[in-house]
């Protein structure tokens, strides 16, 4: 993986790893990208057992999952707690996700979704250009919405996990 002048892995190299992981997916397989621990927040877990008690909360990190569905790549980004999702996005972050092409899906649960290609597939599973667009969208989401750059911060890159 290439590195920036400080010796840290670069976002470009990280994106290349994600492209490779996506292109290697079999039908029904997925890769999940989990934000670094520094992006974790307290979120509600499970349902309430008694209505007068507050919901339990746990430290939760945002994630994006890319799943191969025949010739398409389906992207899911953890949904907003306010809409029944598992992460406490702020109103500004929700708007930023929408601006970056993610949209809530009433049919598929509380998560945000995107598809690549965003048109009719032109051939067998995902051309490299679409895999690169998907990786760039995930990187932009994690870099600009989840962990906006902080001057002087040396934040780690997100983890890429094969499901």
Give the positions of each predicted feature.
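Structured alpha/beta or helical-core interaction and ligand-binding surfaces enriched in interleaved
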Residues: 1-163
């Amino acid at each position: 993986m290439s590195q920036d002048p400080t010796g840290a892995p670069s976002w470009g190299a990280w994106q290349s790893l994600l492209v490779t992981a996506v292109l290697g997916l079999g039908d029904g397989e997925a890769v999940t990208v989990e934000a670094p621990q520094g992006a974790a927040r307290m979120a509600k877990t499970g349902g309430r057992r008694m209505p007068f008690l507050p919901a339990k909360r746990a430290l939760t990190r945002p994630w994006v999952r890319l799943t191969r569905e025949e010739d398409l790549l389906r992207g899911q980004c953890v949904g907003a707690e306010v809409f029944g999702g598992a992460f406490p996005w702020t109103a500004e972050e929700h708007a930023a996700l929408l601006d970056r092409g993610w949209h809530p899906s009433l049919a598929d649960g509380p998560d945000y979704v995107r598809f690549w290609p965003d048109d009719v597939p032109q051939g067998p599973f995902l051309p490299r250009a679409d895999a690169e667009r998907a990786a760039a969208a995930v990187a932009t989401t994690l870099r600009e919405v989840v962990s906006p750059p902080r001057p002087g911060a040396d934040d780690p890159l997100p983890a890429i996990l094969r499901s």
